[in-house]
């Protein structure tokens, strides 16, 4: 169901950035697939035709874990349900009938979610052989990336259908 209080005026963009409140497959499906389906249904019911739909996804759609680098063109073969659900939701966004862009964010960190900082403070060591990498992005950088993409599209710039949001 669509929440009360959603806008009645013209909608120029839809940025779908959800978070599953349950960390098992039905919770992920509810947040990312059913939630997006509901939002797209609302657009159709209201006759809304956004200029673009942005779907905030995850680097979890990639299965690479042997130290290799990935980019937007890397193979997506997720082995876990989280990546599989995100990939399915990405396809829903891409097939929605509007121009769509997937933004695959790495794991968010910020003062509100200090898990990563706590791991470092507690002395967590990362193995060097084979090398292990962690894909992360600060929440402010993630928001700035989305704002940049919106501004670029609004100004008539060309956008790709996929971007990675990862701190350097």
Give, region by region, the residue ranges found by the protein language model.
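SDR active-site strand-loop-helix element
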Residues: 17, 53-59, 103-105
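Short-chain dehydrogenase/reductase
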Residues: 29-33, 68-91, 132-137
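Glycine/proline-rich active-site loop of Rossmann-fold NAD(P)-dependent oxidoreductases
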Residues: 84-87, 96, 109-122, 148-163
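NAD(P)H-binding glycine-rich loop region in Rossmannoid oxidoreductase-like domains
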Residues: 1-42
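Substrate-positioning beta->alpha
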Residues: 85, 115-117, 128-150
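NAD(P)-dependent short-chain dehydrogenase/reductase
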Residues: 80, 94-134
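Glycine-rich Rossmann NAD(P)(H)-binding loop
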Residues: 128-132, 159-168
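Conserved Rossmann-fold NAD(P)-dependent oxidoreductase catalytic core, especially the SDR/UDP-sugar
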Residues: 38-81
